[in-house]
Amino acid sequence: MPQPNINSVHVDAILTNISVAYLQNQDNFIADKVFPVIPVDKKSDKYFTYTKNDWFRDEAQRRAPGTESAGGGYNLSTGSYSADVWAFHKDVDDQTVANADAPLNPLREATEFVTRRLMLRRELQWVSDFFGTGVWADDVTGVSGAPSSGETKQWSDYTSSDPISDLEAAKAEILGNTGMEANTLVLGYDVFKSLKNHPDLVDRIKYTSSQTITTDMLAAMFDIPRVMVAKAVKATNNEGATEAYGFAHGKKALLCHVAPQPGLLTPSAGYTFAWTGVSGGLGATIGTSQFRMESIKSDRVEAEMAFDNKVISADLGYFWNSIVA
């Protein structure tokens, strides 16, 4: 074989401008985007709530000359929050740092690693606290057969389902019970995938657009200001077992009213109270720190955050479970 050849003129080395890691896009996560995040100075505290019915009764009366006006009042109670502290760390030993080839940067990668793990934990906690049955005033389950009370046809049934009517009924339910209009729709990715191909929805835009249906189009079609798609993915296997993955939010949907800006006398389906004490005063932001573990000749990279997801007004939410097959 003639020399030199292709193998003798080059020794394989690590590329310094590329590496491969599966970092989910931060836009996949919605836990800090759906409901207002309230930074709080104390780990636990209370907030005031008003009795809804007191504000809806018609009790004003005609006033005769020389008489007192009709009067009344409202009941006031308190709710409470208690922020759980979540933390995760990775130790980076000195030998690994000293021996790392470019483009590897073990300390920087450790920061990304622990931050993403906490982002996933926050997302899964949001699902547990807000995106399930028994949380909101109205729960509807999607079924493949004939629906009974509390059920509707799954939106993936393109022949029999009517997602537009289902959403209109849900909007009317929230408005009729609270006087507030729904302004946010959260869809699991599988639900969004089914909706954007539903013939009823495609038919509404076929003469005005040839594009694939987007969240903005759904918002306009449903007259709901915000439509959000939850795309976070989680591993469902234990370490060392066969890899398995799934969408964190499942085949579910939530319609709700969210306060655009939290404040006094401002109803909202939910709030997230974020304790600033563990994140450098940054509220929902994940706080990271790096400190020496001399006993194991390593630097520890640690991430920490503290929050409590609270349903504030259950009647401002309408939830669908198993809404697609």
Model-derived features with residue positions:
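Alpha-helical scaffold segments that mediate packing/assembly in large oligomeric complexes
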Residues: D94-E181, Y189-K206, S322-A325
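A general structural signal for short secondary-structure junctions and capping/turn motifs
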Residues: I38, I174-G179, N183-T184, L218-A219, ...
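Protruding loop/beta-arch "assembly-hinge" segments enriched in small, turn-prone residues
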Residues: M1-V40, L282-A325
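Intrinsically disordered, low-complexity linear regions
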Residues: P2-K33, D45-Y50, W136-A169
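Membrane-topology and secretion signals of cell-surface/extracellular proteins
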Residues: L76-S80, L201, G240-T242, Y318-W320
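Assembly/oligomerization interface modules of large self-assembling protein complexes
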Residues: Q24-K90
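Extended oligomerization regions of viral-like shell subunits
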Residues: M180-W275
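A binding-site-centric feature that preferentially detects glycan-recognition modules on secreted/surface proteins
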Residues: P103-F113, R204, K252-L264, G287-S298, ...
